[in-house]
From Swiss-Prot:
This is GDP-mannose 4,6 dehydratase. The modification N-acetylalanine is found at A2. Transmembrane segments: none annotated. GO terms for biological process: 'de novo' GDP-L-fucose biosynthetic process; GDP-mannose metabolic process; Notch signaling pathway. Its EC number is 4.2.1.47. Keywords: Acetylation, Lyase, NADP, Phosphoprotein. Gene3D superfamilies: NAD(P)-binding Rossmann-like Domain (3.40.50.720), UDP-galactose 4-epimerase, domain 1 (3.90.25.10). Pfam families: GDP_Man_Dehyd (PF16363). GO terms for molecular function: GDP-mannose 4,6-dehydratase activity; identical protein binding; NADP+ binding.
Length: 372
């Protein structure tokens, strides 16, 4: 079985204790990413003091959280405070955790691109796998085992070559990438700390979740950006990989709420977060073009397949084998029944609405800044 049962007696903030009610201090790794930015917004609205760990960069990489500064122009911090750090540096993690003394830690930082993990396999293992251990060890070193709750961003890529449909918490894992393998280690080390040290630690097994803040090198955002450019006359054609890969796509904004709910639960448990609906990359393309008034018809097979505009006859989509993964994951569909029952969580944003929001946002972005 994939999931190990939780067997811990008592945890911070559970029951009627005062722990956690007085201080609401969250530390987020990966705060500058899609999920981190939505989570920071969500927690600030709930009255948290939010701390984020950011990697040092030659240029500011805080675009997704600029609006959360007290003074965005001057980068003056309010209830959101940023710390330079890295999941590969255990010393800095101990220093930050000891200084902040968070009540909740959300580990969202990762090299999260599956295809790139084949090129950066060792780095992906160091950040996504061992980086999680470094964080957990830092909690122990700082003596915060009994006062902090830990959320680990797990992934549907753990299921890889799926052993059953749909996938739930007890479905056996079969990762098909260095990313999935690194996240598998992270999953089990979280379970181990939960059982060995009674740490309130959970894995959120999140299926694909997108938004206008999705990174430009992820397939959904590549599609929405390219379609927006075609609509504005800035581009004629773009290339994709496996058009028939099927995914369970939700909205990141819905999924960060589930992260928080897991840490408010009385007992630490692992949860699958998903919509239960499956759509192909091909469908995502078709829906995206529909929102700019174009109908895509497909011609040819395999790498010779193209997507042609029915109205104009122009080819807008081609297939390029370089975008295929060495080992493909063809089908992912999550069963979030447990989260619905125990967390009272369910997705709000439907697939069509998600696609429309992404395309509209990218049309506005490309209209004002074509090189964004």
């Amino acid at each position: 079985m994939a999931q190990a049962p939780a067997k811990c007696p008592s945890y911070p903030g559970s029951g009627d204790g005062e722990m956690g009610k007085l201080r609401k201090v969250a530390l987020i790794t990966g705060i500058t990413g899609q999920d981190g930015s939505y989570l920071a917004e969500f927690l600030l609205e709930k009255g948290y003091e939010v701390h984020g760990i950011v990697r040092r960069s030659s240029s500011f990489n805080t675009g997704r959280i600029e609006h959360l500064y007290k003074n965005p122009q001057a980068h003056i911090e309010g209830n959101m405070k940023l710390h330079y750090g890295d999941l590969t540096d255990s010393t800095c993690l101990v220093k930050i955790i000891n200084e902040v003394k968070p009540t909740e830690i959300y580990n969202l930082g990762a090299q999260s691109h599956v295809k790139i993990s084949f090129d950066l396999a060792e780095y992906t293992a160091d950040v996504d796998g061992v980086g999680t251990l470094r964080l957990l060890d830092a909690i122990k070193t700082c003596g915060l085992i009994n006062s902090v709750k830990f959320y680990q961003a797990s992934t549907s890529e753990l299921y890889g070559k799926v052993q059953e449909i749909p996938q739930k918490e007890t479905t056996p894992f079969y990762p098909r990438s260095p990313y999935g393998a690194a996240k598998l280690y992270a999953y089990w080390i979280v379970v181990n700390f939960r059982e060995a040290y009674n740490l309130f630690a959970v894995n959120g097994i999140l299926f694909n979740h997108e938004s206008p803040r999705r990174g430009a090198n992820f397939v959904t955002r590549k599609i929405s950006r390219s379609v927006a450019k075609i609509y504005l006359g800035q581009l004629e054609c773009f290339s994709l990989g496996n058009l028939d890969a099927k995914r369970d796509w939700g909205h990141a904004k819905d999924y960060v709420e589930a992260m928080w709910l897991m840490l408010q639960n009385d007992e630490p448990e692992d949860f699958v977060i998903a919509t239960g609906e499956v759509h192909s990359v091909r469908e995502f393309v078709e829906k995206s073009f529909m929102h700019i008034g174009k109908t895509i018809v497909w011609e040819g097979k395999n790498e010779n397949e193209v997507g042609r505009c029915k109205e104009t006859g122009k080819v807008h989509v081609t297939v390029d084998l370089k975008y295929y993964r060495p080992t493909e994951v063809d089908f992912l569909q999550g069963d979030c029944s447990k989260a619905q029952q125990k967390l009272n969580w369910k997705p709000r944003v439907a697939f069509d609405e998600l696609v429309r929001e992404m395309v509209q946002a990218d049309v506005e972005l490309m209209r004002t800044n074509p090189n964004a």
